[in-house]
């Protein structure tokens, strides 16, 4: 159910994943406005929150009228949490999901899909954010080590991806959490142009001034590499399912939703890569 009423902005906002890639950026943007109380929640952050410990939910939700929901991999607690959030006074839900999630199967994104469904079925105003892969996957975690080693091997082929800056995603989330007019909307958040992963690797190599080779892997070879690196089987299978979604072209579309919300174009990968390369992160 969707409510499109006009009202004052929320007096309190709970940000799940408050120390994570998008969550911490959302917190920073909201706090910079100084117009609302922002509570970043995580297992070890300012506000304790653990999906596996329901006793942590209600204390975290206390005083929150808006919620930035970053779902767990396990979908089982999501519906009950959203029900409790509504009961505690949350009237605006912003769900972080993923581009193409509506095409995902059992192997990837079950938590995100459950969060989308729970939001739609709730009585709160809801907005879904479906971003592409973040620029920051190249410099903060997922693909940082391979880039430093000079070889990025993935099972994606030549299907393009319009990578998006997590800062743009956070800016959209902050706007949607605090402004009216977004209820019942699904925003697909992409960068301004699509690049293959090989093209992204070349862009980063050029910015860093060092060689980076892209190698196309079969899904089986990619899984074997992840397991050899110590990844748990479930995580390796989830990444494999994510790339299967990409290979099918379900996240290749460039959208204008960042511009629609923010009134400006999204960041481009190339100038971002030059700026990040100057920090020495890929040296």
Predicted features along the sequence, with ranges:
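Cofactor-binding loops of NAD(P)H-dependent oxidoreductases
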Residues: 49-50, 217
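Conserved substrate/cofactor phosphate-moiety recognition/catalytic segment
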Residues: 46
